[in-house]
């Protein structure tokens, strides 16, 4: 919402059931429709009757998903969503924070705008919140032009979004983080998979949700959308303990450590107080460390 690209008169269709409250606050008084599935059918249905335009004066239709996100760590088929969005004159926006650019090339798959918080890129050392906004190439092969991408670029350039002015320290943190990003992300992905497989075999845990498990509803889709593995996040339900009780027996660092750093971070799903499944959104330590804490 802080980018300012969504304007009054536009419609925003989003799959973000774990952040419904944030959408309500950030887009108050806007035409926002939250869908229950990250599917083409759900987005198309929520867009019916809206006369979208790629003209500057609008109105504009926005489709929003996470490359990995929502309750259950869903993975939408960005290829089919991207094609359907263009047919509907919609602009597909993907929050790529969880998977990161290492784990998902959302712009190549069909997004016109990709957003990514840079906590992980900076290894948790950034002094403030940094978010990268990237627009897809508008010039395609054989001199074809992607009208949606070209229009998204024009909107972003004309909305008055703040230009990033990095201090020398911030630029240094970002540069050093980029040098080690691939190795760190591969370790996160590998350890998340090991943790998911361990939890799936643990009798004290149920409903392990991780795109790399064949039991995940989007496993087949994820194999063609995600790269280098299936992301750094695992979500699960505890059998006889609510999230608050579970957190109380763990060291504070599992809740308070900087996002993107080397320590595992645990959180309970937003909007579901008392639920028995605190999802492990960011796995940072070797799998044994996470497993012993349970």
Residue ranges of predicted features:
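Conserved PLP-enzyme active-site core in the AAT-like
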Residues: 1-204
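Conserved C-terminal alpha-helix-loop-beta "cap" of PLP-dependent enzymes
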Residues: 204-291
